Structures are given as C-alpha cells and as structure tokens.
C-alpha cells in the first residue's frame, strides 16, 4: 500500500432484536472484513489510505440504522497496532507481506 496510510480502530454496536437488525450486523461485519482484520466480535483494525477511509465510512453509514446502531472510528498513530498487548486468546495477525504464488 503506497503513499500515506492511516490506522483505524472500528467498533460497532448494532441492534439485533429484529431480523433487519441481524441483517445490518452481518452487513457491517462484512464491510469491515473487506477492509481490515477482526480482532474481537465487533472490533476491527484497518490500515488504509484516507481515500479508502472515505469509501469505508460511506459504506458503513449506508448499512446502519442511525436511530438504533452505533459505529465508532478511532484514527490511531501509525504503528499503534504493532504495540497492541493481548490477554487471553489473541486473533491471528493479518498477513502483511506480499504473497508469491
């Protein structure tokens, strides 16, 4: 990923008492999975360009019901993800090196 990148921590709380809410939850998770790495059930670490961040935020805003759902996006200092400490079972880190097939 060339150029400027940002590290984002995304957390969300989507109301799931209705089938529509459960659908929104799956949609939010699927969107986040397309951009980053799930580190907890409703928490993702994403490294992207500022332009990609705009696309991500637009997709998430479209997916939720703002009257019932909440998404928080924290922009972190670059390199913050590398300093994370885990207690308990930690998720596997994302593959960051180029793949040779």
State what each model feature region is.
Residues 1-39, 43, 47-52:
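Extended, hydrophobic alpha-helical segments
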Residues 63-100:
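C-terminal structural segments of small proteins and small subunits
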Residues 30-33, 57-62, 85-88:
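Intrinsically disordered, low-complexity boundary segments flanking structured domains
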Residues 20, 54-56, 83:
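Short acidic, gly/pro-rich beta-turn/loop elements at beta-sheet edges
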Residues 40-69, 73-76:
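Aromatic/basic micro-patches that form nucleic-acid/chromatin recognition or nuclease catalytic surfaces
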């Amino acid at each position: 990923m060339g150029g400027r990148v940002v590290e984002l921590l995304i957390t969300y709380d989507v109301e799931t008492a209705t089938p529509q809410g459960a659908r929104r939850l799956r949609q939010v998770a699927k969107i986040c999975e397309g951009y980053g790495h799930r580190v907890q059930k409703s928490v993702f670490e994403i490294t992207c360009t500022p332009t990609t961040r705009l696309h991500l935020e637009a997709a998430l805003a479209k997916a939720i019901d703002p009257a019932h759902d909440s998404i928080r996006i924290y922009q972190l200092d670059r390199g913050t993800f590398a300093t994370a400490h885990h207690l308990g079972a930690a998720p596997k880190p994302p593959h960051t090196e180029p793949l040779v097939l």
